[in-house]
Design a protein with these regions (language model features):
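C-terminal regulatory/oligomerization modules of transcriptional regulators
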Residues: 1-7, 131-157
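N-terminal helix-turn-helix DNA-binding core of bacterial DNA-binding proteins
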Residues: 24, 28-70
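Pre-recognition alpha-helix immediately N-terminal to the DNA-recognition helix
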Residues: 18, 45-49, 109
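Residues within helix-turn-helix
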Residues: 60-61, 72, 79, 99
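Charged, amphipathic alpha-helical coiled-coil/dimerization segments
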Residues: 79-138
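Alpha-helical DNA-recognition elements
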Residues: 76, 80, 143
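N-terminal leader segment of winged-helix/HTH proteins
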Residues: 1-37, 84
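Alpha-helical linker/hinge and terminal dimerization helices associated
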Residues: 19-22, 26, 67, 110-126, ...
Length: 157
């Protein structure tokens, strides 16, 4: 008898393992640029996330949620990045409890350095050396997120 569906625990362990490995590999790829900028890969991920939203201020809470860091930790990291000149922090005029963050010119330059680094890596690969459609990966991850949302909804969480 053939197995129709993957076992939940096998699925769970596979996903956790892949997420950890992907995160670790991204950190490795960011490490060189982070070292050059005298920041951590996590701080560089924050800069990249802010760069994707560079037209507007982002609340510290939203930023933390986007990269999976809790409020107190994200706030401290933002303070350090501000001291180093990568971001500006501004209290919201609508709600003074909310602190918004935006990249400075130095922060934008740091994000551009990451982009340059990845473009160089891409150029160094032989033509056809990597046959990956990034949009397909993103679409499949969105489908997984949607599936998990349905499970959460059914469970009443």
């Amino acid at each position: 008898m053939t197995k129709k569906h993957i076992d939940f625990f096998e699925f769970n362990n596979s996903i956790f393992s892949m997420i950890r490995e992907i995160s670790h590999k991204i950190d490795l790829l960011l490490q060189e640029t982070a070292n050059e900028l005298d920041i951590t890969p996590l701080q560089l991920k924050m800069i990249i996330t802010l760069y994707a939203n560079r037209e507007k201020y982002v609340s510290i809470g939203s930023l933390g949620k986007a990269i999976g860091i809790t409020g107190g930790n994200i706030s401290n990291i933002c303070k350090r990045l501000e001291k180093q000149g990568f971001v500006n922090r501004v209290r919201s005029e609508e709600d003074e409890r909310v602190v918004n963050v935006r990249l400075t010119d130095k922060g934008n330059e740091a994000a551009c350095r990451v982009d340059d680094y990845f473009q160089k890596l891409k150029e160094d690969l032989p033509e056809g050396g990597v046959d990956v459609n990034v949009q397909t990966i993103i679409d499949e991850l969105c489908a997984l997120e949607s599936l998990l949302d349905k499970y959460i909804s059914r469970s009443g969480l």
